[in-house]
Amino acid sequence: MRIMVDTNVLFSALLFESVNMNIIFNEIAMNHKLVVCSYVIDELQGVTKEKFPAKIAVVEKMLSKMSYELVYTPKIIDESLFEIRDIKDYPILYTAVIEDVDILISGDNDFFDEKLEVEKPLILRPREFRDMFVL
């Protein structure tokens, strides 16, 4: 399966020691295809620069060593595909939809709002992904 992660999941995986994130990313690397969109990369770099400026080089190095499919998030997007509470999350889900990814992993509550309706991808929290796919 093609599995996309949002900014907070990638941020947690790269900057914090987490057994759960290590397990999740190992599962993806071994059995699936990790997908990262350009919007997430840009957002990750911005958040790192703002909150952890000393870690910018670490993030850059890790991103360059990771194996993933990089997909482009268009600058001009169709804003009528779905409604999401936080408009800043729209480009991430939009990219997941147009790139036909199977699963989007996010810890952001806006992706789990009951009003959000998308047929695909399946949106899971990190723990849900682990419980469903890690044996």
Predicted stretch roles:
Residues 6-7, 37, 107-108, 125:
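A secondary-structure boundary/capping signal
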Residues 5, 15, 21-49:
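PIN/NYN-family metal-dependent endoribonuclease catalytic core
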Residues 9-10, 40, 92, 110-111:
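Alpha-helix capping/helix-boundary segments
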Residues 1-2:
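Residues that mark the start of a beta-strand
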Residues 69-104, 109:
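Active-site neighborhoods of divalent-metal-dependent phosphate/nucleic-acid chemistry enzymes
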Residues 42-76, 92:
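Domain-scale selection of a single, long terminal region
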Residues 109-135:
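Acidic, PIN/NYN-like endoribonuclease modules and their adjacent C-terminal/linker elements
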Residues 26, 95, 115:
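Hydrophobic/aromatic ligand-binding patch that stacks against planar heteroaromatic rings
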